[in-house]
Amino acid sequence: MGKYLDPRADLTFKKVFGEHKNLVISLLNALLPLKDDERVESIEYWPAEKIPKRTQVEKDSIVDVCCKDNKNREFIVEMQMTWTESFKKRVLLNASKAYVAQSEAGGVYDTLQPVYALNFVNENFMKDVDDYYHYYHLVHDKYTDKVIDGLHLVFVELKKFKPQTFTEKKMQVLWLRFLTEITDKTLEAPAELLENPEVSEALKILEIGAYSPGEMRAYDKFWDYISRQRTIANDIRREVEKAKAEIAVAKAEIAVANAKVEEANAEAEKAKAKLKQKDIDTARRMKAKGYAIADIAEITGLTVEEIEGL
């Protein structure tokens, strides 16, 4: 094991950002799309009863820190270790709940303040784009400068982050390097991280020597759970892909069978048309030779009307 613990774990993430206000303020200002006059200056952590209720699975795989600043804006910071398709909807739901909770029954709506949900995702979920940073908010479809300032959702795909490609937003790069480069195998932190006061403080908090045996057991338990979840997710993914492949083969076989049926039907129609034409030719010759209509109908199977029309 190295010198530090991994900052993405439940224990460490909450210790760094859930117990040190200056560090979560720095993180929020670095990662959220805030203008200079919107920067976070001070925060208070949410009381325990205000934090969204979690299922056991969510408790084990989602790490969150929730707070409110001096302007009464709400902030929900989450680390999602394993991606699920329902995650974005759950983020929207929890942010909406935080927004609604600001208003008492019959309250004044113009006092409502925006809610920011900052979500770090440890897996790539938007596979068709290269960007690691995704910002969602309420904007006019045509006039994008027209905004409803209510919910702001940010998703950061950690595995897509490449620090060498960014020259601006220094603190954003430093915090993302902190979250992606520091693991429990790290023997020495990069100099750029140690030189920054906030990140250096966060690194100090991650040093293994600062944790009790009980905390280390909780840390190991967290990663054991994440490992099991990844194994289960990979197994499910493989089974889904296998099922999709089998369905594709079955669909192809059905398509071939349908094509053969259509071909057989077409051949049957052609044969039927040939027989019909043969009967018509026979009827025409019989009619020319003066056979009675009734006799022609009996021999060819044509109707009286069809024979009279020849």
Task: Please tell me what each predicted stretch does.
Residues 24, 114, 152, 168-175, ...:
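Short runs of predominantly hydrophobic/aromatic residues within well-ordered alpha helices
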Residues 18-22, 92, 141, 166, ...:
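Short capping/connector residues at structural and topological boundaries
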Residues 1-152, 162-164:
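Accessory alpha/beta interaction modules
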Residues 94, 132-138, 169-175, 222-223:
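Short intrinsically disordered coil segments
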Residues 28, 118, 156, 202, ...:
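A residue-level signal for conserved active-site and pocket-lining positions in enzyme catalytic cores
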Residues 14, 29, 96, 177-180, ...:
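Generic alpha-helical structural context detector
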Residues 150-173, 180-181:
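Extended serine/threonine-enriched, polar tracts that run as long, contiguous segments within proteins
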Residues 75-80, 173, 180-310:
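Short, charged alpha-helical interaction segments and adjacent helix-coil junctions
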